[in-house]
């Protein structure tokens, strides 16, 4: 009996497309799905391809060359644990199990530890690019046993996205490192999307720009510093029309949903004591948008500015928004990469930040030209503390901070919500501040809780019996 080179479990759209991607690179693929009809459907649609369906987990695993390589693309959480439990009795030492789902990194750490006891290699692999990326080439973030990674690297390089011929895949680190980086990627994606949405609202409601004008503006932006996948699709979204010839964007309900993964990075930030303010505000912005009924009521009760909109120079304002958006994006990445550094230190992952930026350059949702700037900065200095302190990004920050400040002032003046722009300038001012009002907070803590404080003129910790 001929055996296949790799098996894929989970035939929803992502698993299906990854299987097809792998097969297209001259690999033979076994497929399995708990629901028999789904497996049959995938096979029947691809009979001419080197894909072999199996309907029992034992037959599926027996069909694979040793050491077996099995890729899981199932729902994260309980479903992944149940699938591993189902597969485990049939696995042998040195087999490789790859979890390519959108998995919480602590689950990956736990599973890696458990499977290591059986001498089974477990790779937690972040995959970005959506269903089309899975089919045509995603950005891939594998973490786990390095020796196992080396065995699957030839396949991963072939199926990954390419940036100027360079595969967008690199070994991230041990156990949960790959899924942690994917989590940070998702958080940056949240931040990017919210910043772009706030830019759209400022242009639409302060300049009364039409959808055609918005599309044209974003098209120009996409030819410069802001060149990215998200800017590219946004310019297309503005001019998409429905079956009645109406602009679709104007008929989409203003409620942004999420799959719950956005909050993971914010929870981790709190655990690590990392000020991930912009990205966390982008998560909260989605939650606030979901309060649609309450917002309708509030719009009739709570007052805002009643002054008439007046922007003297339209082109100058558009440029201010562009600059604010670029600096906001930089601050978002600065926060995300700062958190990666803190997590790497805590979990002893030894992350390579320049390599991480490189694999984001193609295939993934946050792909953008400016990622090369991040790679360049880490190439010149492997001990970057914060991207805002590097030569290129500090230069941009100093040139663009006034635009970011002006945009937030305009938003406040005219009552337009800009949570991530506001978080960006607040973080920027706090981060560059020689002094913050935290001395008063520490005095208050000592006053009511005897928590002590440090002094600027003496070493050690002090407590005062404050006057009542």
Curated annotation (Swiss-Prot):
<feature type="binding site" description="in other chain">
    <location>
        <position position="259"/>
    </location>
    <ligand>
        <name>substrate</name>
    </ligand>
</feature>
<dbReference type="GO" id="GO:0016054">
    <property type="term" value="P:organic acid catabolic process"/>
</dbReference>
<protein>
    <recommendedName>
        <fullName>6-phosphogluconate dehydrogenase, decarboxylating</fullName>
        <ecNumber>1.1.1.44</ecNumber>
    </recommendedName>
</protein>
<comment type="function">
    <text>Catalyzes the oxidative decarboxylation of 6-phosphogluconate to ribulose 5-phosphate and CO(2), with concomitant reduction of NADP to NADPH.</text>
</comment>
<dbReference type="InterPro" id="IPR006115">
    <property type="entry name" value="6PGDH_NADP-bd"/>
</dbReference>
<keyword id="KW-0560">Oxidoreductase</keyword>
<dbReference type="GO" id="GO:0004616">
    <property type="term" value="F:phosphogluconate dehydrogenase (decarboxylating) activity"/>
</dbReference>
<feature type="binding site" description="in other chain">
    <location>
        <begin position="185"/>
        <end position="186"/>
    </location>
    <ligand>
        <name>substrate</name>
    </ligand>
</feature>
<dbReference type="InterPro" id="IPR008927">
    <property type="entry name" value="6-PGluconate_DH-like_C_sf"/>
</dbReference>
<dbReference type="GO" id="GO:0019521">
    <property type="term" value="P:D-gluconate metabolic process"/>
</dbReference>
<dbReference type="Pfam" id="PF00393">
    <property type="entry name" value="6PGD"/>
</dbReference>
<feature type="binding site" description="in other chain">
    <location>
        <begin position="128"/>
        <end position="130"/>
    </location>
    <ligand>
        <name>substrate</name>
    </ligand>
</feature>
<feature type="binding site">
    <location>
        <begin position="10"/>
        <end position="15"/>
    </location>
    <ligand>
        <name>NADP(+)</name>
    </ligand>
</feature>
<feature type="binding site" description="in other chain">
    <location>
        <position position="102"/>
    </location>
    <ligand>
        <name>substrate</name>
    </ligand>
</feature>
<feature type="binding site" description="in other chain">
    <location>
        <position position="286"/>
    </location>
    <ligand>
        <name>substrate</name>
    </ligand>
</feature>
<feature type="binding site">
    <location>
        <position position="451"/>
    </location>
    <ligand>
        <name>substrate</name>
    </ligand>
</feature>
<feature type="binding site">
    <location>
        <position position="102"/>
    </location>
    <ligand>
        <name>NADP(+)</name>
    </ligand>
</feature>
<keyword id="KW-0521">NADP</keyword>
<dbReference type="Pfam" id="PF03446">
    <property type="entry name" value="NAD_binding_2"/>
</dbReference>
<dbReference type="GO" id="GO:0006098">
    <property type="term" value="P:pentose-phosphate shunt"/>
</dbReference>
<dbReference type="InterPro" id="IPR006183">
    <property type="entry name" value="Pgluconate_DH"/>
</dbReference>
<keyword id="KW-0311">Gluconate utilization</keyword>
<comment type="similarity">
    <text>Belongs to the 6-phosphogluconate dehydrogenase family.</text>
</comment>
<dbReference type="InterPro" id="IPR006114">
    <property type="entry name" value="6PGDH_C"/>
</dbReference>
<comment type="subunit">
    <text>Homodimer.</text>
</comment>
<dbReference type="InterPro" id="IPR006113">
    <property type="entry name" value="6PGDH_Gnd/GntZ"/>
</dbReference>
<dbReference type="InterPro" id="IPR013328">
    <property type="entry name" value="6PGD_dom2"/>
</dbReference>
<feature type="active site" description="Proton donor">
    <location>
        <position position="189"/>
    </location>
</feature>
<dbReference type="InterPro" id="IPR036291">
    <property type="entry name" value="NAD(P)-bd_dom_sf"/>
</dbReference>
<feature type="binding site">
    <location>
        <begin position="33"/>
        <end position="35"/>
    </location>
    <ligand>
        <name>NADP(+)</name>
    </ligand>
</feature>
<feature type="binding site">
    <location>
        <begin position="74"/>
        <end position="76"/>
    </location>
    <ligand>
        <name>NADP(+)</name>
    </ligand>
</feature>
<dbReference type="GO" id="GO:0050661">
    <property type="term" value="F:NADP binding"/>
</dbReference>
<feature type="binding site">
    <location>
        <position position="445"/>
    </location>
    <ligand>
        <name>substrate</name>
    </ligand>
</feature>
<feature type="active site" description="Proton acceptor">
    <location>
        <position position="182"/>
    </location>
</feature>
<keyword id="KW-0570">Pentose shunt</keyword>
<comment type="pathway">
    <text>Carbohydrate degradation; pentose phosphate pathway; D-ribulose 5-phosphate from D-glucose 6-phosphate (oxidative stage): step 3/3.</text>
</comment>
<dbReference type="InterPro" id="IPR006184">
    <property type="entry name" value="6PGdom_BS"/>
</dbReference>
<feature type="binding site" description="in other chain">
    <location>
        <position position="190"/>
    </location>
    <ligand>
        <name>substrate</name>
    </ligand>
</feature>
